[in-house]
């Protein structure tokens, strides 16, 4: 279903890209929004999949606490980092917003009951917040904002 949506969105973007736009027109703003959503989806998919697969619950008897196994998935990490670096070259703010979107996805899954273990959810959230440094993306301090809104409304 996601693939069909992405292809449909690609078709819309391709059709819109061939036409000339007036910068103030509604269709130009719609084109920008669709392009941003497509870019975000392209990055979100491999990165959220990398985070989701990074920690898996190891099967244990019911009387023992669940343990986690760290999965080394270099291919998914490379795909995630490659996409995140491409976005960061254009805008560090966009890269940060993508990381925040992944964290929000994880939190929604946690609250909807997808995660039964709080430790797994916390480990994945921590990994997500560290994605930029894992991928070697560091902010340009000359152009970074003084404070960045984070999930939960906390300002840093």
UniProtKB/Swiss-Prot annotation:
Taken from the UniProt record, the cysteine pairs bridged by disulfide bonds within this chain are none
Localization recorded for this chain is: Vacuole, Aleurone grain
User: Mind telling me which InterPro entries this protein's record contains?
Assistant: Bifun_inhib/LTP/seed_sf, Bifunc_inhib/LTP/seed_store, Glia_glutenin
The stretch of residues making up the signal peptide is 1-19
Does the record carry Signal as a key word?
yes
Q: Name one GO molecular function term.
A: nutrient reservoir activity
> Mind telling me which GO cellular component terms the entry cites?
aleurone grain; vacuole
Q: Which UniProt keywords are present, listed alphabetically?
A: Seed storage protein, Signal, Storage protein, Vacuole
Enumerate the residue ranges of region (Octapeptide unique to cereal prolamins).
77-84
Q: What does this protein do?
A: Seed storage protein; serves as a source of nitrogen, carbon and sulfur for the young developing seedling.
Alphabetical list of PANTHER family matching this protein: PROLAMIN PPROL 14P (PTHR33454:SF19)
Family, according to the entry, reads as follows: Belongs to the prolamin family.
Q: What's the name of the protein?
A: 13 kDa prolamin C
């Amino acid at each position: 279903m996601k693939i069909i949506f992405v292809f449909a969105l690609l078709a819309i973007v391709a059709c819109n890209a061939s036409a000339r736009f007036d910068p103030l027109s509604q269709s130009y703003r719609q084109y920008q929004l669709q392009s941003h959503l497509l870019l975000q989806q392209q990055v979100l998919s491999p990165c959220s999949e990398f985070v989701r697969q990074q920690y898996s619950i190891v099967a244990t008897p019911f009387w023992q606490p669940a343990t986690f196994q760290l999965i080394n998935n270099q291919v998914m990490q490379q795909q995630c980092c490659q996409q995140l670096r491409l976005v960061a070259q254009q805008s560090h703010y966009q890269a940060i917003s993508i990381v925040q979107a992944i964290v929000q996805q994880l939190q929604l899954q946690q609250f909807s009951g997808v995660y039964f273990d709080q430790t797994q959810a916390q480990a994945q959230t921590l990994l997500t917040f560290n994605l930029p440094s894992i991928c070697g993306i560091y902010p340009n301090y000359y152009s970074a904002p003084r404070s960045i809104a984070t999930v939960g409304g906390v300002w840093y």
